[in-house]
Amino acid sequence: MRAPGRIRREKGRHALVDDIPFALPVASHESPALIAAFTIDAGAAAELLVGEEVHPLRIWGERALLLISVVDYRSTNIGRYVEFSIAIACTHGASAGPALVPALPLAQRLFGTGQYVIDLPVSSEVSVKGGKGIWGMPKHQANLDFVIAPRTVSSQYDLDGQLCVRIEVDRPRFERLPLAMRTSNYCAFRGMLMKSNISFKGHAGFNLPLTRSARLLIGEHPRVQSLTRLDISSRPLFSGYFPSTEGILDDHIDSWFLSFKDPPTSVPQGLESVAGLGQSQEWLAPPDDPALGEPGAQAATP
């Protein structure tokens, strides 16, 4: 899928936003990634979505979808970093859409289909400064890795010396399926619902649906305890691995005030959380990940 013409026309231009220099378009190159989708309870998922205009995308009955995706961004405007996304597939509108239909390519624009990002730890401080301060993503710096082994690809997310989340995906036998798509990310920041779009392409491999091809482990850190209430399926609906991707993050952002029936009583996180951040590309120490001991395992490094 081609990026919009406006983005293609930006090629070769430059921007300076929040003191971060960007060579446009905002792109990534040669970046491997993994993805795994698990079914979850739609009612419990709805409790994690802020506001009343974003709704869990139901796959069937009262089952929605938890999306775990991790990217080893090897070449970007702001250096190399790992990004660990925890999100819920969603629709955007006054009411929830029917089951499954919003996931169909021709219906996605009608239903505002995308993913609501619950948590987005990253390796570097500058990634937090840009991703959160500009696009409103819930980024924060954490202990992350991305490990490619002969039979598996995995990532572990630690914080404050505790395990938060670990995901491991079996490597498919065939990893050369061409794939290109565009998706939307929804996030809550500064009392607003923020929407950003990303286009990416690459070659991928996918495992058979509903097999034990991916393993998700939720730790005991308080930050991720809400995930334990989602009734996450033991087997993924699908899982896959991208040996390399090329991506473009749209510099256009949509935002709406988050409104409620009653006046909000708590102040949402705002610009004070990013105002003092610098542009360091240094990573925190890697987590204590058992995958690092596998023969032939290769871990991402700064």
Predicted regions: what is each one?
Residues I68-D119:
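Hydrophobic/aromatic-rich structural module bridging two neighboring secondary-structure elements via a short loop
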Residues I40-G43, Y73-T76, T91-S95, E125, ...:
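Generic structural motif
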Residues W60-R63, T91-A96, F111-Q115, L144-D145, ...:
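Glycine-rich loops and low-complexity Gly/Arg-rich segments
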Residues R2-I20, D119-P302:
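Interaction-surface and assembly-scaffold signal
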Residues A23, D72-I78, Q141-N143:
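Catalytic micro-motifs at enzyme active sites that drive phosphoryl/nucleotidyl and oxygen chemistry
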Residues L34-A36, F84-I86, S155:
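Hydrophobic residues positioned within well-ordered beta-strands of beta-sheet architectures
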